[in-house]
């Protein structure tokens, strides 16, 4: 079962729909309507942190959940969720030089885990005004996708089953979004079984 922390974003249910189409069981909880103990009781196989209209500091239980469950269950963050992952581990989330709302970018990726078997570069849809500052990304992370300008578009933890994407895989304008989600689940389901 996947627990989706909903950061009050309209895109959350697009993610939920994609994951449902992949045959996954989902529980969705708003970021202010669940506690760490309640998450423990649900015993999810995966934790996903949704996009949202705010900063990581305003994302309810998202930061605490990432801290608590890092290394216990696979975690995937989208947009705000991605920024929250970086911040938990010591990265700085700052105002982007260019606001990206409903704009697409070609991103180059490393072809591993979530990007395995996907076209390179691929088109990613962006809706954000904040971004992870590249020089502050902790050394425990690898940048797995970026724009030609060097903006971080995806990260992967080097040792733990944690990944984040700055763009929106659930947007119809993003290439291979559903495949990325499938790749995440298939890659890290092994971690759940182990």
Curated annotation (Swiss-Prot):
* Record domain Glutamine amidotransferase type-1: where: 1-194
| Residue numbers annotated as active site | 79, 168, 170
The UniProt entry, under Pfam families, shows: GATase (PF00117)
What EC number(s) does the entry state? 2.6.1.85, 4.1.3.27
A biological-process GO annotation = L-tryptophan biosynthetic process
Tagged with keyword Cell division: no
Please state, per the UniProt record, what induces or represses the expression of this protein: Repressed by tryptophan.
Q: Which domain of life is it from?
A: Bacteria
Please state what is observed when this gene is inactivated. Requires tryptophan and has a partial requirement for p-aminobenzoic acid for growth.
Task: Give UniProt keywords alphabetically.
Answer: Amino-acid biosynthesis, Aromatic amino acid biosynthesis, Folate biosynthesis, Glutamine amidotransferase, Lyase, Transferase, Tryptophan biosynthesis
A GO term, aspect molecular function:
4-amino-4-deoxychorismate synthase activity
Gene3D superfamilies from the xrefs? 3.40.50.880
**What span is annotated as the signal peptide, if there is one?**
none
Can you say what this protein is called?
A: Aminodeoxychorismate/anthranilate synthase component 2
Q: Which organism is it from?
A: Bacillus subtilis (strain 168)
Q: Which gene encodes it?
A: pabA
């Amino acid at each position: 079962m996947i627990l989706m922390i909903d950061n009050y974003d309209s895109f959350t249910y697009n993610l939920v729909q994609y994951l449902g189409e992949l045959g996954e069981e989902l529980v969705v909880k708003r970021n202010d309507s669940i506690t760490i103990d309640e998450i423990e009781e649900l015993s999810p196989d995966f934790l996903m942190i949704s996009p949202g209209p705010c900063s990581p500091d305003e994302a309810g239980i998202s930061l605490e959940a990432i801290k608590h469950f890092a290394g216990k269950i696979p975690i995937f963050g989208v947009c705000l969720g991605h920024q929250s992952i970086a911040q938990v581990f010591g990265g700085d989330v700052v105002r982007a030089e260019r606001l990206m709302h409903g704009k697409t970018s070609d991103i180059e990726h490393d072809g591993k885990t979530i990007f395995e078997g996907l076209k390179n570069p691929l088109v990613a849809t962006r809706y954000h005004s904040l971004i992870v500052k590249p020089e502050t990304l902790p050394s425990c992370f690898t940048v797995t996708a970026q724009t030609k300008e060097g903006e971080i578009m995806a990260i992967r933890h080097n040792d733990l089953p944690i990944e984040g994407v700055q763009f929106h895989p659930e947007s119809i304008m993003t290439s291979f979004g559903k495949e990325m989600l499938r790749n995440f689940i298939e890659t890290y389901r092994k971690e759940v079984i182990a």
